[in-house]
Amino acid sequence: MRRSGSPEHPEPTGTPGRTGRCRRTAGAVAAALLLPALLSACGGPADAAPPDEITVMTWAPSGTGSADRPGMTALAGAVGHELNAGGGLAGHRVKVLTCNEHNTAEGATECARQAVAAHALAVVGSYSQYGDAFMPTLEAAGIPYVGGYGLSTPEFSSPFSYPVSGGTPALIAGSGQQLVEAGCKSVAVVRPDTRAGDTLLGFLAGALKPAGITLKDVKAPERSNDYTEIAKKAIGDDRAGSCVIVALGFEPTANLLDPYRRLQPRRTQLASVIGSFQQSVVDATGGDAGPLSGALATGWYPPESSQVWDVLRSTVRLHGGGVPIDVSDPGVQTTWVAYEVFRQAVERAGNGKQITTKALRGVLDGGEPIETAGATPPLSWGLTNMLPSADSPRLVNTAVTFQRVQGGRLVEQRAGFVDVRKVLAG
């Protein structure tokens, strides 16, 4: 974000969203849910915030364990502080609300209801796998969902969603292409034994098939304290040209690394995607002396060491209030990019004018590219930018980055972005 001024004790931008469920009768609940949708359809309060203030919401799970993303909501507050310290956004003070999504469908729905009740102009830089639960509520109120983490199908199909990355599909397709370039002869993919895991397998196969690379499917439980047998199956006979890609969540990936290290494969190339591990995990597992030394990684954005993130680091330092925020976390980076998109779109919607959700969506749908200072290619959600896919037409950013753990740091393996659009489009 652009800055002008950095007070040591910035004024809070808003109060955290409540996550408790109010006790109402069934009739009252139905009426409460119906009213915002009716009002927004008529251009009522759900469509317009107070003329001197912009309200925005960011949500993510907290207190759930491995799904927690506290850095995303913390960064949202820091960005709000920074914007207000510089005079606000397009002549308006910014009020940032946060909500604990609890990693449940009910929690996601409640957060969406709070956004409607608060007349939020947008939901920005949020994390939830329950798009089927929250998106209908936002759609009914006309509220755009800008820069979600990309965990659910509606984020790439709803006309009210504006994703800033290609989600897991782009990462997996990109990882497959990275392994092809690494000279892999066979690839074992360790992936969750779920429907989502089945989908990931398809994207990976699409990237490997043109090169004639053998793909071995290693299904793994999403939760386990011992992945020894999974690691053994993935490594196999540890012959030259063998590669293993870990496509699990953050916590199971960490649990898999321990038996992988003990097995000490000498010829197998390890690979994964940013989100399954990141710089903080490399540090925690021994850096260059750990199991991730030499590992390949595919990400949405440049590595944390890139100068692209200097402004993010400055925002955290000056406006984060001392709250720990891991700038190598792809969730934090996604929130950062999402707020940059939101900032520019609001400024284009009209400086000093009352800004509505309809006006904001009009800017985002207009097709004029939005620059993110190198964190992504220019982003645009115009019709000509849509992916030719019935399932994920809103997946407009098909670029990934190739990284590698070298000297204990995640660094660029190849400069710039790699486009995997052909793989994703089939």
Language-model regions, residue ranges each:
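Bacterial signal peptide processing site
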Residues: 43-46
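Extracellular/periplasmic periplasmic-binding protein-like sensory domains
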Residues: 260-337, 417-421
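Segments of small-molecule ligand-sensing domains
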Residues: 321-328, 344-410
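Beta-alpha junction/loop-to-helix N-cap segments that form part of ligand/metal-binding clefts
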Residues: 51, 68-74, 87-154, 222-224
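Extracytoplasmic "Venus flytrap"
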Residues: 49-78, 86, 99-106, 193-197, ...
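Extracellular/periplasmic Venus flytrap/periplasmic-binding protein
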Residues: 159-264
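C-terminal motif of bacterial Sec signal peptides marking the signal peptidase cleavage site
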Residues: 37-41
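Periplasmic-binding protein-like
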Residues: 115-128, 146-148, 186-191, 238-256, ...
